[in-house]
């Protein structure tokens, strides 16, 4: 029986490259030169931003988003936290979300059921397995999922026939 998995994954190597590109862009910008920094924690997928003022943090977030887009990483996975003061500096965290949580998985399964396709969807940890009798049914399910916005980038992998 044909099946595929719906996942939400980040390419960690591309993510590292995007942050490095953002650091280079920060050094190139005359208005931000020497006034801010990016610190990427690969373990917990967090980028710590430090600057002298709030408006500089906003500019740095835009630089980071632009670098992510250039590296073909969907910006929807970026969750920007509130900025806070730390001495004379302003700090802000940007967390990159990966994986499908239970709430999003339920939305995906519900959307597939609403579409009344001849497929079954089952939640398996941080992914959703979709099975059907025909490959065409699976392609319709993929089209239905791509048409709806879930707030997270979705990838389809592990096709089995």
UniProtKB/Swiss-Prot annotation:
Belongs to the YajQ family. GO terms for molecular function: nucleotide binding. This is Nucleotide-binding protein Pfl01_4421. The keyword Nucleotide-binding applies. InterPro entries: DUF520, UPF0234-like_C, UPF0234_N, YajQ-like_sf. SUPFAM superfamilies: YajQ-like. Nucleotide-binding protein. The keyword Nucleotide-binding applies. It comes from Pseudomonas fluorescens (strain Pf0-1). One of its GO terms (cellular component) is cytosol. It holds the Pfam family DUF520. It comes from the Bacteria. CDD domains: YajQ_like. Keywords: Nucleotide-binding.
């Amino acid at each position: 029986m044909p099946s595929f998995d719906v996942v939400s994954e980040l390419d960690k190597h591309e993510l590292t490259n995007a942050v490095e590109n953002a650091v280079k862009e920060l050094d190139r910008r005359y208005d931000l030169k020497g006034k801010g920094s990016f610190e990427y924690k690969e373990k917990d997928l967090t980028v710590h931003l430090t600057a002298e003022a709030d408006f500089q943090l906003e500019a740095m977030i835009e630089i980071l988003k632009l670098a992510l887009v250039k590296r073909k990483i969907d910006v929807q996975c970026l969750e920007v936290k509130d900025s806070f003061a730390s001495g004379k500096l302003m700090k802000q965290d940007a967390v990159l979300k990966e994986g499908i949580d239970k709430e999003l998985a339920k939305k995906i399964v519900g959307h597939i059921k609403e579409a009344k396709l001849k497929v079954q969807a089952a939640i398996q940890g941080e992914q959703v397995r979709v099975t059907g009798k025909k490959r065409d049914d699976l392609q319709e399910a993929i089209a239905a999922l791509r048409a709806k916005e879930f707030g997270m980038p979705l990838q389809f992998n592990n096709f089995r026939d």
